[in-house]
Amino acid sequence: MSARAGIVVTGTEVLTGRVQDLNGPWLADRLLELGVELSHITLCGDRPADIEAQLRFLADQGVDLIITSGGLGPTADDMTVEVVSRFCGRELELDPGLETRIGEIVTRLMARFPDVDPAAVIAANRKQAFVPDGAVILDPVGTAPGVVVPGTPTVVVLPGPPRELQPMWQAAVAADAVQTAIADRVSYRQDTVRMFGLPESGLAETLREAEGSVAGFDRLEITTCLRRGELEIVTRYEPRDADAYDGLLNMLRDKHSRELFSEDGALVDDQVAALLAGRTIATAESCTAGLLAARLTDRAGSSAYVAGGVVSYSNDAKTDLLGVDAELIAAHGAVSEPVAEAMAAGALQRFGADTAVAITGIAGPGGGTPAKPVGTVCFSVALADGTFLTRTSQLPGNRSDVRERSTTVAMHLLRRALSGGG
């Protein structure tokens, strides 16, 4: 059996949902890369009794390694190190070298705040220099050091802010106590494929068929997830079972060649960015109000190919900013394929681009009709050679869902237009 680990995410702000937990998923991925089985991720507030209860629960599960995040600050409710020390049966001790290091960091940070007494802040942060006897100290990225406490299980204590936790991870893994705890880890491969336009029920049917026809299928650990209207299929397996994974991938290719758009885990955003190299793109958006333009510019370097965009929410804006004929809108309605094509053509001309994408739809909750219910969205991709790729989709969900899914549909339509997929 592979080495097993558990994660304890602490913080009342995380427990109550005011702050999203980014550490649990990130740490889970890192453990997976190491070949360590993740047994549990638990969330608890800042109460010492609750933190200790999570530690004892994971220890009772027989995990080899526990990783905690959060509760390492200088305030009264930052109690994780003290709780872990008690759980591991160790005394807290002041580390003079660490105290000096934290003082230097605080002094440097306080230089930006001349009205604040650095000595008072250093005194408040002195608490962070107390560590369990025999623990390995992980150098702080902010003011909070991490610690590795050897034992059964070994406990790694990391800060809560991801910008401090993530740079500390490699040092934590390199600690002798952690290497001993995960010595029985198994080397796994993990592959991700992505599909668009296939319902989950269709994928489930294919996987049921694969169960009976792909040799070694039972040794594949398959996880499926619907994200932004796309299906993500993550498969983990031991290297010796590569043939089984190849068999599954071949079946997915045979049955869903049109829907399968990524075999290496690449996102459609990555693919579109690559396809836009050497081109310029403009956007014309109504119901999404700039969400597509924002998504296109999420990638560093997007200024090389994004020319600009227009949010033409009203009919007058479609006419004044994009040159859409008012009579066309009157004849077909603002949410129609002819208007989407006219918007895309207008964006091409306005920005001098060679590629344009237009979105016009009814995001709801009102505005729908029997002929065009809420969720009706029209898309058009226009190329400088006069080619148009135009579609109408009926998208499920609330207003936010429809708007977000619209950007995904537009990205895939753009991918198909630029790759010649049609």
Curated annotation (Swiss-Prot):
SUPFAM superfamilies attached to this UniProt entry: CinA-like, Molybdenum cofactor biosynthesis proteins
Pfam families to which the protein is assigned, alphabetical: CinA, MoCF_biosynth
Family stated for the protein in its record: Belongs to the CinA family.
HAMAP family found in the cross-reference section: CinA_B
NCBIfam families: PncC_domain (TIGR00199), PRK00549.1 (NF001813)
This protein's name: CinA-like protein
